[in-house]
Curated annotation (Swiss-Prot):
Name recorded for this polypeptide: Protein translocase subunit SecA
Organism: Clavibacter michiganensis subsp. michiganensis (strain NCPPB 382)
Subcellular location: Cell membrane; Cytoplasm
Purpose of the protein: Part of the Sec protein translocase complex. Interacts with the SecYEG preprotein conducting channel. Has a central role in coupling the hydrolysis of ATP to the transfer of proteins into and across the cell membrane, serving as an ATP-driven molecular motor driving the stepwise translocation of polypeptide chains across the membrane.
Biased composition (Basic and acidic residues): 930-941
Protein keywords: ATP-binding, Cell membrane, Cytoplasm, Membrane, Nucleotide-binding, Protein transport, Translocase, Translocation, Transport
Parts forming coiled coils: none
Length: 941
């Protein structure tokens, strides 16, 4: 029964559909007019629509003509005419909704409609896909439609240079994955020059497979990180050895449902004996506890060939939703290192966060957001609460003919798979194509062996051979084909009966060496003939497949998400084709074992039902729905909490990134420097003097601190003399004198360097200090979040505590930024150089002890989320990151030292050592310390 919230969300659905139908009618009325246009006249429609929009007409007003133009361009270039329901879907997207369209209804073609309409505003449109292959394929194919209308298309792919990315973003419509768009946003907010930025804003986005991207992948943030120092690798290896000696239920206990472990007293004693320590839980040993927990989790919760595989000396994650190997992705929080130590392969270093954003908060940046999927209704409430997106179900073009059969339940897995093989063999013999869905690599290979033994020819599409996945899926609807797939979520390629003519035609064109980008004229000339030949062959075979019953989808296990099950079923019965689906289950399936197993087990009885006899039962079906509901609710709660905590950081991120953007865009920093100077002097005075008079003040300590900030020229005696006596010196008087002296020093500094050089120095100093302090702040916030759950033990709300303490940390960071900026401005040794060439604006400066953050760009890692908590790590060039070696760590530390104002180690002939702000002092160089850090150091002494 639908929940109250679901009923509320469906209110107005009929009214929305009527509005969309009216748009479709308006487009149909214009269709004949557009068919009479020449190619040149059709292309000029874009120019005319842009002029009208510039003169005040809204995009809503232009929708019928824009959609009619796209429909005609598509008919001419691709031979595909948008159906009325596709026009309705396009209108729903333009209005900022999620269009729920069943598999095979042509979502890729639908996206061209709102993309073109919103590109009329000349502010850039982003079409987000689930992988690089689909981004490239769709931009190439749909780019032909946009080019016929005089618009440009770009694609963002891993490994592109900043210049290439800038060019792709400058296009009217840009395709790419959520990871690439998100990382470019983060990189833009680490840029040193405005010219280094690649994106031009966040105007409108269409997200394909929106549930996969905005729901499944929303639990883990995008992270840009660099290698961190430490000897953690040794401890991972040490604790992997310890974990092997620990016995389940004696030394530790495991909760598979909650994915947690707990160490028992006997286990703690074994660990303490192995390490030679008295108490694992005393403060000095606290960091070791996480190593112990991770090593036990790696042993008990993460299974080889199910959760991960080991290939070429690397641990590679298997995506639980798609069954693919996630190349370069890693579990976070030390889990991946623990698994590497368990398997005896090289343990890679953990990384330090430099920039991060969740997908929820990245997509909230868009002025207007929309999405498409075949299965959004189950998550409608979350889409509305998180993204303010309504879900609009779009009718199918033709009535659904697929028959969804009841589940068959067996006592054990062996009996289940025996019956699965018999069913497949029978369908295969009749020529009916079969698509089999499994939940793991291990099970797909087990089934493959059984099919081979039975003599059934088949293709296996799993995490170990996904390079050919698009080609395999495109042919899964051919006569007599059998395809075993670990999962069909996010595949993105239609299974058409008789074969995918469009895919085959593109492959044939590529085989001829033709490209719509590099050889557009020849491509357009030959496309029609090639497509017609392929289509004729496919249509002939499709008729035979329809006679055999259409595509048969067989699921070997229920997934924990109803959407994944529905996506698998949805591969059959596209566009009104006949089809059939059925799930085979057993009592030993993971979902049945972990949730509600009792009801099913009691129904079947351990002795009364033979192994090879299946039952169909409403009790079991209810148990499955209940189990899936529990898992979905748990995952939704995780995403909700991720968002709550990231919202705290997001407000801080917006403030910092907004500051950086203004600086990059040329804000005059002179006024900011003056404000910083006043604030820092106020802070110094607050820490050294009270509200009374000077009799009780420590003037020596005050002047010592001021000298670290700027070259103070007035003396204590001069201030006292000016006031008349020490007792007549008050705070306002001292502040006025010191501030006057500091501003005079600032003017002298500007006069010495020149106005233009001073502005450039201010820009570089502020950016450098902001970036380093923000990086350290992210580390502090991570550390705070890791331990914030303990506040609940003190009867305090962890989220409220996180907000309060996070704000305090932010205030401390801002104070440190102000203080260090002032110190650097006055104390850095600066060499002013003439412009490099006639085109350069202003002088160049060399500031000793200050370096741009791009120094570490080649060592940055890019971490992308997966729905199972794993992370994808690539380097700056988009290549999979293989290892964080000791040398890389050493190099990173050296570059970090430069970034924080240190010099390289001196040789006897080298320059003098520099102090906290890069000034020559004759003392050893050290990391910049703000006032709070210096006090902590003093207290330790």
């Amino acid at each position: 029964m639908a929940s109250v919230l679901e009923k509320v969300l469906r209110v107005g659905e009929g009214r929305t559909l009527r509005k969309l139908q009216n748009y479709a009618k308006a487009v149909n009325q214009l269709e004949e007019d557009f068919t009479h246009l020449t190619d040149e006249e059709l292309k000029n429609e874009t120019v005319e629509l842009r002029e009208r929009h510039a003169n005040g007409e809204s995009l809503d007003d232009l929708l019928p003509e824009a959609f009619a133009a796209v429909r005609e361009a598509s008919r001419r270039t691709l031979g595909l005419r948008h159906f009325d329901v596709q026009i309705m879907g396009g209108a729903a997207l333009h209005l900022g909704n999620i269009a729920e369209m069943k598999t095979g209804e042509g979502k890729t073609l639908v996206a061209t409609l709102p993309a073109y309409l919103n590109a009329i505003a000349s502010r850039g449109v982003h079409v987000i896909t689930v992988n690089d292959y689909l981004a490239s394929y769709q931009s190439e194919l749909m780019g032909r439609v946009f080019r016929a209308l005089g618009m440009t298309t770009g694609v963002i792919l891993a490994g592109q240079t900043p210049q290439q990315r800038r060019e792709q973003y400058a296009a009217d419509i840009t395709y790419g994955t959520n990871n690439e768009f998100g990382f470019d946003y983060l990189r833009d907010n680490m840029a040193w020059q405005a010219s280094d930025m690649v994106q031009r804003g966040h105007f409108f986005a269409v997200v394909d497979e929106v549930d996969s991207i905005l729901i499944d992948e929303a639990r883990t943030p995008l992270i840009i990180s660099g290698p961190s120092a430490g000897d953690a690798n040794r401890w991972f290896t040490e604790f992997a050895t310890v974990a092997k000696r620990l016995v389940p239920e004696v030394d530790y206990e495991v909760d598979e449902k909650k994915r947690t472990v707990g160490v028992l007293e006997a286990g703690i004693e074994k660990v303490e004996d192995h390490l030679g320590i008295d108490n694992l839980y005393e403060s000095a040993n606290t960091p070791l506890i996480s190593f112990l927990n991770n090593s036990i989790k790696a042993k008990a919760l993460f299974k080889k060939d199910k959760d991960y595989v080991v290939m070429n000396g690397e641990v590679l994650i298997v995506d639980e939703h798609t069954g693919r190997i996630l190349m370069g992705r890693r579990y976070n929080e030390g889990i991946h290192q623990a698994i590497e130590a368990k398997e005896g392969v090289a343990v890679k270093a953990e990384n330090q966060t430099l920039a991060t954003v969740t997908l929820q908060n990245y997509f909230r940046l868009y002025k207007k957001l929309s999405g498409m999927t075949g299965t959004a209704e189950t998550e409608a409430a979350e889409f509305m609460s998180t993204y303010k997106l309504g879900v609009v179900p779009i009718p199918t073009n033709r009535p659904m003919q697929r028959k969804d059969q009841s589940d068959l339940i067996y006592k054990n897995e062996k009996a289940k798979f025996e019956q699965v093989v018999e069913d497949i063999a029978e369908r295969h013999a009749a020529g009916q194509p079969v698509l089999v869905g499994t939940t793991s690599v291990e099970k797909s290979e087990y089934l493959s062996k059984l099919l081979a033994k039975k003599g059934v020819r088949h293709e296996v599409l799993n995490a170990k051979n996904h390079a050919r996945e698009a080609a395999i899926v495109a042919q899964a609807g051919r006569l007599g084909s059998v395809t075993v797939a670990t999962n069909m979520a996010g595949r993105g390629t239609d299974i058409m009966l008789g074969g995918n003519a469009e895919f085959l035609a593109v492959a044939a064109m590529n085989a001829r060496g033709l490209s719509p980008v590099e050889t557009p004229e020849q491509y357009e000339t030959e496309w029609d003939d090639v497509f017609a030949d392929v289509k004729a062959e496919v249509d002939e075979e499709a008729a035979k497949v329809i006679e055999a019953g259409g595509l048969y989808v067989l699921g070997t296990e229920r997934h924990e998400s109803r959407r994944i099950d529905n996506q698998l079923r949805g591969r059959s019965g596209r566009q009104g084709d006949p089809g059939e689906s059925r799930f085979y289950l057993s009592l030993t399936d993971d979902l049945m074992r972990l949730f509600n197993n009792g009801a099913a087990a009691s129904l079947m009885g351990r002795d009364s039902v033979p192994d090879d006899v299946a039952i169909e039962s409403k009790v079991v079906s209810r148990a499955i729905r209940s189990a899936q509901g529990q898992v979905e609710a748990r995952n939704a709660e995780i995403r909700k909490n991720v968002l709550k905590y990231d919202d705290v950081l997001n407000r801080q991120r917006e403030a910092i990134y907004g500051d950086r953007r203004h600086i990059l865009e040329g804000d005059d920093l002179q006024e900011r420097s003056q404000r910083f100077l006043e604030a820092v002097i106020d802070d110094v005075l607050d820490s050294h003097i009270g509200e009374g008079n000077g009799d009780d003040w420590d003037f020596d300590a005050l002047w010592t601190e001021l000298k670290t900030l700027y070259p103070i020229s007035i003396t204590i005696d001069e201030v006292i003399t000016e006031a008349g006596s020490k007792g007549r010196v008050n705070r306002d008087f001292v502040r006025r004198e010191i501030l006057s002296d500091a501003k005079l020093a600032y003017s002298k500094r500007e006069e010495q360097l020149g106005g233009a050089a001073m502005r450039e120095l201010e820009r570089r100093v502020v950016l450098s200090v902001i970036d380093r302090r923000w990086r350290e702040h992210l580390y502090e916030m991570d550390y705070l979040k890791d331990g914030i759950g303990l506040r609940a033990m003190a009867q305090r709300d962890p989220l409220v505590e996180y907000q309060r303490e996070g704000f305090a940390l932010f205030q401390q960071m801002m104070g440190a930024i102000r203080e260090e900026t002032v110190g650097f401005l006055f104390n850095l040794e600066v060499e002013v150089q003439a412009p490099a060439d006639a085109e350069s604006v202003g002088p160049r400066i060399q500031a000793k002890g200050l370096a741009a953050n791009q120094a570490t760009a080649d060592k940055l890692r890019y971490t992308a989320p997966t729905d199972d908590g794993g992370v994808e790590v690539r380097n700056q060039r988009g290549q999979i990151e293989k290892a964080a070696t000791a040398k890389a760590q050493k190099d990173q530390q050296a570059e970090d030292a430069v970034l924080v104002g240190e010099d390289e180690p001196e040789t006897p002939q080298g320059p003098p050592a520099r102090g906290a702000f890069g000034q020559p002092t004759g003392a050893s160089s050290s990391a910049p310390q703000n006032r709070e850090e210096r006090r902590k150091a003093d207290r330790r002494k």
